[in-house]
Amino acid sequence: MGEKPWQPLLQSFEKLSNCVQTHLSNFIGIKNTPPSSQSTIQNPIISLDSSPPIATNSSSLQKLPLKDKSTGPVTKEDLGRATWTFLHTLAAQYPEKPTRQQKKDVKELMTILSRMYPCRECADHFKEILRSNPAQAGSQEEFSQWLCHVHNTVNRSLGKLVFPCERVDARWGKLECEQKSCDLHGTSMDF
């Protein structure tokens, strides 16, 4: 065995870290620019390399707006919005012909959410909805439509407007991923 048997695993982890750093930089609006005299060197989150760390422009970090986000605890509304965004995005990426395991995973996820959701009142309501309307995950369309109807059930109980489920794909369509890397086809460590 080589001098560093963990090297391949750590290299994969470094690739993942770099990918996450790149996506976060893109998300918050930092451009990846080559180092200049105005840049300050900052340590990367993870590095296996002994070469100098990536340089970023500290002035660009200081000028980022906070986008009207409070610094207090997450509200029920924020949590709900984030959860629905995640679930609808998951449904949009769900395969048209899921495996038995994928169908089982969706149903388990819904059950786990109904037990572990941080808002107890919301979790109990979701549990009631699941009892009368179990998760449907036979295809991408079926899962997306089921989720839309469940979301509308929650919205009605909150006195909110309902969403026209025939427009669910237009609202929550596939992510824009290179080479369809976002599609649910199993697990991979290739980044």
Curated annotation (Swiss-Prot):
Q: What happens when the gene is disrupted?
A: Embryonic lethality when homozygous.
Residues annotated as domain ERV/ALR sulfhydryl oxidase = 72-172
Record-given protein name? FAD-linked sulfhydryl oxidase ERV1
The subcellular location is: Mitochondrion
Effect upon mutating residue 177 to A? Loss the capacity to oxidize thioredoxin
Function, in words: FAD-dependent sulfhydryl oxidase that catalyzes disulfide bond formation. Oxidizes thioredoxin in vitro. Required for the import and folding of small cysteine-containing proteins in the mitochondrial intermembrane space, and can act independently of the oxidoreductase MIA40. Can oxidize the cytochrome c oxidase assembly protein COX19, a typical substrate of MIA40.
- Stored InterPro entries: ALR/ERV (IPR039799), ERV/ALR_sulphydryl_oxid_sf (IPR036774), ERV/ALR_sulphydryl_oxidase (IPR017905)
Q: What is its EC number?
A: 1.8.3.2
Gene3D superfamilies per the UniProt record, alphabetical: ERV/ALR sulfhydryl oxidase domain
Lineage at the top is:
Eukaryota, Viridiplantae, Streptophyta, Embryophyta, Tracheophyta
Q: Which reaction does it catalyse?
A: 2 R'C(R)SH + O2 = R'C(R)S-S(R)CR' + H2O2
Residues annotated for FAD binding in this entry: 76, 81, 84, 121, 125, 148, 151-152, 155, 160, 171
Q: What is the effect of changing residue 182 to A?
A: Loss the capacity to oxidize thioredoxin
Q: Which Pfam families did the record assign?
A: Evr1_Alr
PTM notes: Contains three disulfide bonds; one catalytic disulfide (Cys-119 to Cys-122), one structural disulfide (Cys-148 to Cys-165), and one shuttle disulfide (Cys-177 to Cys-182).
Question: What keywords sit in the KW lines?
Answer: Disulfide bond, FAD, Flavoprotein, Mitochondrion, Oxidoreductase
